[in-house]
Curated annotation (Swiss-Prot):
GO molecular function, one term: protein homodimerization activity
Protein's name according to its UniProt entry: Phosphate-specific transport system accessory protein PhoU homolog
GO process annotations (BP): intracellular phosphate ion homeostasis; negative regulation of phosphate metabolic process; negative regulation of phosphate transmembrane transport; phosphate ion transport
Pfam family, one: PhoU
Keyword Cytoplasm: yes
Principal location: cytoplasm
Keywords: Cytoplasm, Phosphate transport, Transport
Summary of the function given for this chain in its UniProt record: Plays a role in the regulation of phosphate uptake.
SUPFAM superfamilies xref list: PhoU-like (SSF109755)
Domain of life, per lineage: Bacteria
Cellular compartments per GO CC: cytoplasm
Length: 240
C-alpha cells in the first residue's frame, strides 16, 4: 500500500474524529443553553418556558444516541493509541452531557411546582450556584475543544468551590424551614434543584478528567477535593 494512500486514510480518519468532537461540543452547548434557560425560568416563574425546556431534553438524548453510533463506527476501524483515547473520550463525555441535560430539565420541572407557592429569597442563591455550574460546564467543553490541559485542571480544582456553595445553600434552606414550617415544601423543591446543580458540576469535572485522560493517557490523578458537607448536617430539628 503506497504512502499517499496511507496519508489519505489517516487524514480521512482525523477529519472524522474532528467532526465527532464538533458534534459533541454542539451537544454540550445545547445542554448549557438548557441549564441557563432553566435558571432563567426559576427566576421568572415561567411555566410555559419550563415545559419547553423539559420537552427539549429529548433533542440531547437523540444526539447522544447518534454520537454513540458514530463512535462505535470509528472504533471498528482499529484506532491507534492516541486515537483510541479520543474514541473513549467520545463515548464518556456525551454520557456526562446527557446527564447535565437531564438535571437541567429536572430544575425546570421542579420550577413549575415551585410556581404554585409564594416566591422565596433563596432563589437568588440557587441562581448563583447554577451560574457556577454552567461556567464549569462551559470551561470543561472549552478544554475538550482546545485540548487544553490547564483549563481541564482548573475545572477539576474549582469543583470544591461549587461544593462549598452548595453546602452553604443547603444550610440556608434548612434554617429557613426551621423558621416557618410553611417554608418546608418550597424549600424541599429548592434543595432538590440545588442538588441537581451540584451534580451538574460533578459531571463537568468528569468531562475535564476525560480531557486529562485524552491528553495524558492512564495517569493517576490526585484525589478530587470534595467540600460537600451536607451529610454532616443535623436534621433532627426539622424531623422532630
Amino acid at each position: 500500500m503506497n504512502s499517499s494512500y496511507n496519508h489519505h486514510i489517516v487524514k480521512s480518519y482525523d477529519d472524522e474524529l474532528n467532526r465527532l468532537v464538533t458534534e459533541i461540543i454542539r451537544m454540550g452547548e445545547i445542554a448549557v443553553a438548557q441549564l441557563e434557560a432553566a435558571l432563567d425560568v426559576v427566576e421568572r416563574r415561567d411555566d410555559k418556558a419550563a415545559d419547553r425546556i423539559v420537552m427539549n431534553d429529548e433533542a440531547i438524548d437523540a444526539l447522544e444516541q447518534s454520537i454513540s453510533h458514530e463512535v462505535m463506527r470509528l472504533a471498528l476501524r482499529g484506532p491507534m493509541a492516541r486515537d483510541l483515547r479520543e474514541i473513549l473520550a467520545g463515548l464518556r463525555i456525551p454520557a456526562d452531557i446527557e446527564r447535565i441535560g437531564d438535571y437541567a430539565a429536572n430544575v425546570a420541572k421542579r420550577s413549575i411546582a415551585l410556581n404554585t407557592m409564594p416566591p422565596l429569597p433563596q432563589t437568588a442563591s440557587l441562581r448563583a450556584l447554577g451560574q457556577l455550574s454552567a461556567q464549569a460546564v462551559r470551561n470543561s467543553l472549552l478544554s475538550y475543544s482546545n485540548k487544553d490541559e490547564q483549563i481541564a485542571t482548573n475545572v477539576r480544582e474549582n469543583d470544591a468551590r461549587l461544593d462549598a456553595q452548595y453546602t452553604a445553600l443547603f444550610r440556608e434552606l434548612l434554617t429557613y424551614m426551621m423558621e416557618d414550617t410553611r417554608n418546608i415544601t418550597p424549600c424541599i423543591h429548592l434543595l432538590f434543584m440545588a442538588k441537581n446543580l451540584e451534580r451538574i458540576g460533578d459531571h463537568a469535572t468528569n468531562i475535564a478528567e476525560n480531557v486529562l485522560f485524552l491528553l495524558n493517557g492512564e495517569q493517576m490523578l490526585p484525589p478530587r477535593e470534595k467540600c460537600d458537607n451536607t451529610s454532616n448536617v443535623n436534621l433532627d430539628c426539622i424531623l422532630d
